């Protein structure tokens, strides 16, 4: 279901929506990008405008696109036939640019694979590829200089759109670059083929290009010899970073660009297949914005039958997003975005009175003598109803990983569960008990399905049913309300806070940060039932 959510208001029913989340703070998770094929028609979408009146903002747009796909991506076709298909998608792009221009949009982002589609072989994608000169070497305006290079029709159209809309434009396409046999890495067919993002300024100049580094089962494309660490400057918001889809889970280029170039804004074309409970598209987008205190402009393709939906304009404190697994329509999101994003309140700069639950949390962390630690519970002088018996530990598969979990029973309690070196802790209270099973899970190890990467995860999840073996299943609805602290002794500083409530709603934590060498997330007053609250740590050096 898709719906709108505005802090302080009631949920409004809407057939197609952008979910608007305003508020003190926000965070979320991560995911896998993939591609399969299905023929879907073209739709031009609705658009949502989020209105804010900050002095220092710019207007951004992201477009979730139900791309018109090749009916047979394995077939060998002519360049002309390939252009006919791509021009159908580009016609829709142009309509979105003109709609955005009427709203004074200054930058628009289109999704990965939105122009050419997916599931090609190296040979069958060739007619879809544009020649790509290096913007570092050649200054070029494709719209004004269309005959300078052959096989650049897609680049020309995108350049002209940027001019017509008077906006920066970010899009993704397949590109080719010839190589010489003297190059030991040159493929046998004499060319490199790249999954490429391009950036045009509002005057149509090709500002830069980024070639995807972390391919996700994309046999049609090559990995660049060196990682493209690409940033571009704008007159309206300063410096932006750029990367694509699966890149978000790896150090290069995503983390390195943020660390080395001090960017406050990221443009992020993606073709992301949702996988709950931890890796939905809007989860990772939001988590990235919160973890680094930046703005993320994320555009996904829209193919619900493939599990592909979820785009958004995310700041650390609010999100304007779209997720709809039922409707085939596209969606244009437009929002005003702060030039200087404000981050969440961390442990080190929190002010005001500490609430009782936080005092309890701090006592437990400090090993306060008023608290006696047992295997699974803590008895503090003011706590009367902790879990008397330690709940059983069990194992269940979540996201293809073997999690160790404990059930979350009762209206209040303190639990912990450990695996390898990671221990996860939960201090919670519930106003009422729901007829649902929740569990606290831990995983510390190498994830090896659909990519290989080392993760440390502490997760509070609603299980699919009442049996322990249902914990880790994909669910989107829940009624359980919690006030809680979730924390763990992570051995990485790269921790992404995942927070999802009923109906694919992005939730805002009250506080995040380090306390006594443990990273914690605190939340009270959920807006709807809890689906997932997790801390997703990445140990890049152990990949």
Swiss-Prot record:
It is an enzyme of class 3 (hydrolase). Residues 1-41 form the signal peptide. Its EC number is 3.5.1.12. It comes from the Eukaryota. Glycans are attached at residues 119, 150, 203, 349, 402, 489. GO terms for biological process: biotin metabolic process; central nervous system development. One of its GO terms (cellular component) is extracellular exosome. The active site is at 112 (proton acceptor), 212 (proton donor), 245 (nucleophile). It catalyses: biocytin + H2O = biotin + L-lysine; biotin amide + H2O = biotin + NH4(+). It is found in: Secreted, Extracellular space. Keywords: Disease variant, Glycoprotein, Hydrolase, Secreted, Signal. Belongs to the carbon-nitrogen hydrolase superfamily. BTD/VNN family. This is Biotinidase. The lineage of its organism: Eukaryota, Metazoa, Chordata, Craniata, Vertebrata.
């Amino acid at each position: 279901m898709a719906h709108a959510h505005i802090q302080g208001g009631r949920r409004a029913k809407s057939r197609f929506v952008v979910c608007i989340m305003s508020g003190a703070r926000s965070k979320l998770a991560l995911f896998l990008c993939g591609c399969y094929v299905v023929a879907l028609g073209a739709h031009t979408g609705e658009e949502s405008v989020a209105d804010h009146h900050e002095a220092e903002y710019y207007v951004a747009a992201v477009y979730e696109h139900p791309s018109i796909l090749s009916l047979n991506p394995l077939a060998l076709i002519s360049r002309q036939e390939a252009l006919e298909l791509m021009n159908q998608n580009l016609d829709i792009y142009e309509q979105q640019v003109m709609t955005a221009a009427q709203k004074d949009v200054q930058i628009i982002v289109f999704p990965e694979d939105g122009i050419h589609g997916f599931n090609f072989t190296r040979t069958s994608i060739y007619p879809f590829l544009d020649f790509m000169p290096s913007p570092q070497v050649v200054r070029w305006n494709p719209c004004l200089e269309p005959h300078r290079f052959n096989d650049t029709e897609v680049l020309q159209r995108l350049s002209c759109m940027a001019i017509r809309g008077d906006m920066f434009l970010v899009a993704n396409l397949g590109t080719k670059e010839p190589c010489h046999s003297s190059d030991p890495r040159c493929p046998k067919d004499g060319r490199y083929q790249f999954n490429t993002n391009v950036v045009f300024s509002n005057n149509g100049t090709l500002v830069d290009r980024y070639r995807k580094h972390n391919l996700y089962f994309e046999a049609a494309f090559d990995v660049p010899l060196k990682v493209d660490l690409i940033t571009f400057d704008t007159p309206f918001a300063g410096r932006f970073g750029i990367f694509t889809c699966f890149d978000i889970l790896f150090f290069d280029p995503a983390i390195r660009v943020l660390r080395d170039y001090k960017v406050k804004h990221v443009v992020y074309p993606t073709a992301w297949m949702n996988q709950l409970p931890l890796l939905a598209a809007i989860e990772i987008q939001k988590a990235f914005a919160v973890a680094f205190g930046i703005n993320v402009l994320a555009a996904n393709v829209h193919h619900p039958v493939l599990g592909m939906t979820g785009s958004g304009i995310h700041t650390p404190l609010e999100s304007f997003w779209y997720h709809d697994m039922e409707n085939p329509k596209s969606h244009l999101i437009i929002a005003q975005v702060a030039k200087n994003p404000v981050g969440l309140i961390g442990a080190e700069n929190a002010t005001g009175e500490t609430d009782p639950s936080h005092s309890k949390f701090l006592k437990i962390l400090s090993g306060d003598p008023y608290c006696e630690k047992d295997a699974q519970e803590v008895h503090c002088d003011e706590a009367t109803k902790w879990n008397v018996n330690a709940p059983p530990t069990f194992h269940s598969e979540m996201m293809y990983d073997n999690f160790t979990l404990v059930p979350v029973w009762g209206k209040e309690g303190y639990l912990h569960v450990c695996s390898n070196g990671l221990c996860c802790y939960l201090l919670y209270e519930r106003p009422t008990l729901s007829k649902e099973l929740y569990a606290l899970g831990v995983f510390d190890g190498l994830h090896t399905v659909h990519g290989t990467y080392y993760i440390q995860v502490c997760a509070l999840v609603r299980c699919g049913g009442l049996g322990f073996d249902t914990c880790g299943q994909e669910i989107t609805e829940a009624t359980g309300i919690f006030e809680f602290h979730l924390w763990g002794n992570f051995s990485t500083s790269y921790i992404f806070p995942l927070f999802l409530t009923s109906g694919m709603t992005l939730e805002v934590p009250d506080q995040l940060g380090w306390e006594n060498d443990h990273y914690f997330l605190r939340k009270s007053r959920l807006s709807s039932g809890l689906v997932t609250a997790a801390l997703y740590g990445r140990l890049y050096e152990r990949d």
